Design a protein with these regions (language model features):
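Short Gly/Ser/Thr- and Asp/Glu-enriched loop/turn motifs at secondary-structure junctions
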Residues: 63, 138-139, 362-369
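PLP-dependent aminotransferase class I/II
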Residues: 276-355
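N-terminal basic, amphipathic alpha-helical segments
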Residues: 1-114, 127, 304, 308-315, ...
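Conserved core of the PLP fold type I
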Residues: 110-244, 256-268
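Proline-centered loop/turn at the N-terminus of a beta-strand
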Residues: 166, 213, 245-247, 273-275, ...
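Conserved active-site segment immediately N-terminal to the catalytic lysine
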Residues: 262-281, 301-302, 403-406
């Protein structure tokens, strides 16, 4: 298959850096020069250079160009779709906002104690951002926490208006939710989530028991399966929640990657029983521990009371910087960049899977490929092969069924050809 201009530029610059043709701190050829050299558009060059900054080969100087970053042995990996490294464009933009935040506001930010719910201005910024995404709420129903883990911890500990005690979780699910339930010895039940959703009849039986306080769900780009509920499925789940007085905790951690703008549970909710959670660390950078919760009115006081015990408020400097980052359009710019990269990755992965003899066993997700394991000759041999596969052990609160494994997007081209010997020959194409 012919290598794209984008990849040719990346390969050329990587090789030149690794062989010492470009030394640490040296400016590389300009965008215009590279575009001429490779007979491509400036946009293609910019995307390639951006990718190399994510991989820590280059760094950018505003109004100057790109320079070679100091190299460390065995440090580089191909970039996964999830842009969670600190040296990326989102980080550079956010650092600009932090610097702007500190100008003339030192006394305010270092000596002020804000509302326990978070700075009003950042909650108003988030309110506007959510409105753009079809999620409508007044700013006084938004509460900021120091990450999703803190939000889930608070919700698991407080009493809900329905006076129930059990938490329902999907299996598999976010590993930190499993850890929270296990470490706090909280009462819980589970329901199986697969590549098509959940069994609604089973869900009704569980709700009907009368003990479910809330149902924690990841409706869009489920972790780790990548599945998203259809609008019809969401409406059915909400109807059951209304009927049996169950709250829904909607973790929309990758909602920004949904180019279809499918309605959220919160949008569809008519009975004020959805708690909507949006994290800002997943799509910006992992050190940004700010998560927003949209709460029903009945939960505002108990959440804020319990939050006071844990901490008074989240980092004010980071809150103010996030407000600026949203208000000046950088957040939406980063979102567009993520969607563009996701589209590119999906096209690349689709080509890889359609050309693979393993095609019947493969399912594309937003960040990689799922591998169905029922036809593997020896699961033990595959597990000990050294191949970079995620078998989802931590995503199950009890024993892992080993039904699926994930190949990360960045590993797909290398790993797929090495998997064929592990499968029954008659199941290949």
């Amino acid at each position: 298959m012919k290598t794209s201009k984008y990849q040719q530029i990346i390969d050329f610059l990587k090789k030149a850096i690794q062989q010492g043709q470009f030394e640490t701190g040296q400016k590389i050829p300009s965008v215009r020069q590279l575009a001429s050299q490779f007979s491509c558009s400036k946009d293609t060059v910019q995307r390639a250079l951006l990718d190399l900054t994510y991989q820590h080969f280059l760094y950018a100087k505003p109004q100057s160009g790109y320079y070679v970053l100091e190299q460390e042995p065995n440090r580089h990996e191909d970039l996964p779709l999830k842009l969670d490294k600190d040296r990326n464009q989102a980080f550079e933009d956010f650092r600009t906002c932090i610097n702007e935040t500190l100008i003339g506001r030192e006394n305010y930010l270092f000596n002020n104690f804000s509302d326990q719910a978070g700075l009003l201005e950042v909650r108003q910024s988030i309110q506007g951002l959510l409105k753009e995404e079809g999620i409508y709420t007044p700013s006084d129903q938004i509460v900021l926490t120091a990450g999703t883990q803190q939000a889930l911890n608070i919700l698991s500990q407080i009493d809900f208006p329905n006076k129930k005690s059990q938490i329902l979780i999907e299996q598999p699910t976010y590993h930190r939710m499993n850890q929270l339930l296990d470490s706090q010895q909280l009462a819980y039940r589970t329901i199986q989530r697969n590549l098509t959703g959940i069994d609604l009849e089973e869900l009704e039986e569980i709700f009907k028991s009368g003990h479910i306080k809330f149902f924690y769900t990841i409706p869009r780009f489920h972790y780790p399966l990548g599945h998203s509920y259809s609008t019809k499925q969401k409406e059915a789940i909400l109807q059951l929640a209304d009927q049996y007085d169950v709250y829904l905790v909607e973790d929309d951690y990758l909602g920004d990657l949904d180019g279809s703008n499918a309605p959220s549970f919160h949008y569809l909710d008519q009975k004020d029983r959805v708690i909507y959670i949006k994290s800002f660390s997943t799509n910006l950078f992992s050190a940004l521990r700010i998560t927003s919760m949209i709460l029903p009115q009945a939960l505002l006081k108990p959440v804020l009371t319990y939050k006071t015990i844990l901490d008074y408020d989240s980092n004010l400097i980071m809150q103010k910087a996030l407000s600026l980052y949203i208000d000046n359009g950088m957040y939406l710019t980063n979102k567009k960049r993520l969607l563009a990269r996701k589209k590119e990755e999906e096209a690349r992965l689709k080509t890889l899977t359609t050309q693979s003899p393993l095609l019947p066993h493969l399912t594309l997700t937003h960040d990689g490929i799922l591998l169905e394991l029922s036809q593997v000759q020896s699961l033990a041999a595959l597990k000990h092969s050294g191949l970079p596969l995620d078998f989802f052990e931590a995503a199950y609160i009890t024993s892992c069924p080993y039904q699926l494994a994930k190949i990360k997007s960045a590993d797909a081209a290398n790993v797929l050809p090495k998997l064929t010997p592990f499968f029954e020959r008659e199941t290949l194409v």
